[in-house]
C-alpha cells in the first residue's frame, strides 16, 4: 500500500496522458470486475485512452480540473471535474487498489473540490454506478447525500447509477 505521505497531488497536463491511461484502465479493471463485462475490460486499449486523455488535457477549458496523485513509483490515481456556474461535477475519481485505504482518495477528492470552489463552485455532484458499493460508501462517509437514480447504457447492457450531492462544496474541500 502506498503511504499517504509519499504521494503528491498535482495538476495533470498533456504529458501525463500515458500515465492517466494506464491508471484509468487498471483502476477500471480492478473496480468493475464482475460489474462490467470481462470482454469490455480486457479490450480497453492504452493507446486509445492515452489519445483521449491527451486531447482532453490539450483542449481543457477554464473551470475544468484534472489532478493526479503521484507516488514513489508513478501515478496511482486521478480525479477530474468541472464547474458550470455555481455547480460542479466530479466525473472521475480512481485510485489503484494498492493506493486505497490510506486517506489518499479523500485527499485527492478534497483537493479537486478546493480547485472547483476557487473558480466559483458552491455545490458538487457526481454519479456512481449502483454496483460500485465501495465508492458509494466512501461518498456517504464523506458527506455525500444520495439522490436521483438514472439508467446508463453501455458495456453491453443497462446499469443504474445514483447521484451524490454536497450542497456546500466548502465542507468537502475542508475535509482534508
Describe every region a protein language model picked out.
Residues 2-7, 11-17, 22-35, 39-100, ...:
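Acetyl-CoA-dependent GNAT
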Residues 126-135, 153-157:
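Conserved beta-strand-loop-alpha-helix junction that forms the acyl-donor binding cleft
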Residues 140-148:
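Conserved acetyl-CoA-binding loop of GNAT-fold acetyltransferases
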Residues 27-29, 135-140:
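K/E-rich alpha-helical interaction surfaces of small helical-bundle regulatory domains
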Residues 64, 159-163:
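Short hydrophobic/aromatic beta-strand or adjacent loop that forms the aromatic wall/cage
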Residues 117-127:
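Conserved GNAT acetyl-CoA-binding A-motif
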Residues 172-174:
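Acidic/histidine-enriched, glycine/proline-rich intrinsically disordered or flexible terminal extensions
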Amino acid at each position: 500500500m502506498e503511504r499517504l505521505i509519499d504521494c503528491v497531488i498535482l495538476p495533470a497536463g498533456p504529458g501525463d496522458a500515458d500515465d492517466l491511461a494506464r491508471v484509468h484502465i487498471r483502476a477500471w479493471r480492478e473496480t468493475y470486475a464482475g460489474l462490467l463485462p470481462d470482454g469490455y475490460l480486457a479490450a480497453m486499449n492504452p493507446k486509445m485512452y492515452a489519445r483521449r486523455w491527451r486531447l482532453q488535457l490539450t483542449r481543457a477549458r477554464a473551470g475544468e480540473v484534472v489532478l493526479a496523485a503521484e507516488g514513489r513509483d508513478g501515478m496511482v490515481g486521478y480525479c477530474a471535474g468541472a464547474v458550470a456556474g455555481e455547480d460542479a461535477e466530479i466525473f472521475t475519481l480512481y485510485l489503484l487498489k494498492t493506493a486505497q485505504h490510506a486517506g489518499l482518495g479523500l485527499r485527492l477528492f478534497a483537493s479537486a473540490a478546493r480547485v472547483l470552489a476557487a473558480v466559483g463552485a458552491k455545490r458538487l455532484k457526481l454519479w456512481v454506478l449502483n454496483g460500485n458499493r465501495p465508492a458509494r460508501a466512501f461518498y456517504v462517509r464523506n458527506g455525500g447525500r444520495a439522490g436521483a437514480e438514472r439508467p446508463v447504457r453501455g458495456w453491453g447492457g443497462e446499469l443504474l447509477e445514483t447521484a451524490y450531492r454536497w450542497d456546500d462544496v466548502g465542507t468537502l474541500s475542508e475535509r482534508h
